[in-house]
Design a protein with these regions (language model features):
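Conserved catalytic neighborhood of penicillin-recognizing serine enzymes
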Residues: 21, 70-144
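Active-site-proximal alpha-helical segments within enzyme catalytic domains
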Residues: 1, 20-26, 59-67, 122, ...
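Active-site-proximal helix/loop microenvironment
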Residues: 151-183
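Active-site SXXK
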Residues: 23, 45, 50-78, 114, ...
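Solvent-exposed loop/turn segments at secondary-structure junctions
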Residues: 21-25, 32-36, 52, 81-84, ...
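Periplasmic/cell-envelope proteins involved in peptidoglycan metabolism and beta-lactam response
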Residues: 1-51, 55-56, 73-74, 139-150, ...
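Generic, well-ordered alpha-helical scaffold segments in large soluble proteins
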Residues: 1, 68, 117, 125-129, ...
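Secondary-structure capping and boundary motifs in well-ordered enzyme cores
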Residues: 17-22, 39, 48-54, 103, ...
């Protein structure tokens, strides 16, 4: 199917299919043509290199919020908002002002609605609540990165992630992300 995207300069792609109940890999395609050096065909694009996952990482953030007492019915205000970019209130840099893809604000929305519509502002507010990194005073890894690790994502290793992490601002392999969805 990658050939159908050639006019968009797409020459490589990957697919991972996992049985959710067991985590068994049912199919994995790392390249459309193993022998094509022009597209790095011998690199398994399903496993490496890592790529930014975009909004597909948002469920990891919301799962961490559920562990801290939120539910799908929890209300979040989707309104103009600003945050310290690192999540640290003492961060001296310009505030981070997330926007939704549609450029609109939707007022009070449930977590269910925010995730179903992939609203960015509620996702960032959720990460601001959950925190990026773990609280050292808790026995369990409880930040978004800790939750990602518990779900099998090992590629979030930088010490400087900001709140855009929940919008796909970190790198992950397709195999790890797909596996996390099966946990």
């Amino acid at each position: 199917q990658v050939s159908l995207l050639a006019d968009k300069n797409a020459h490589n792609g990957a697919l991972v299919s996992i049985k959710p109940s067991t985590g068994e890999i049912l199919a994995m395609v790392g390249s459309p043509d193993f022998n094509n050096e022009a597209i790095s065909g011998q690199i398994n694009m399903a496993d490496s290199p890592t790529r930014q996952p975009g909004s597909s990482i948002k469920p990891v953030n919301y799962i961490a919020a559920f562990e801290k007492g939120w539910t799908p019915a929890t209300l979040i205000w989707d309104v103009p908002s600003e945050f310290p970019p690192s999540g640290d209130p003492n961060d001296p840099r310009e505030p981070y002002r997330p926007v939704n893809y549609d450029g609109e604000f939707h007022g009070p929305v449930t977590v269910r609605t925010a995730l179903a519509n992939s609203f960015n502002i509620p996702a960032v507010k959720t990460l601001d609540f959950v925190k990026i990194y773990d609280d050292p005073n808790t026995p369990q890894k409880d930040g978004m990165i800790g939750m990602a690790e518990r779900l099998g994502i090992t590629s979030f290793t930088r010490p400087d992630y900001g709140l855009s992490l929940t919008l796909g601002g970190g790198d992950v392999s397709l195999l790890e992300l797909t596996s996390a969805y099966s946990v």
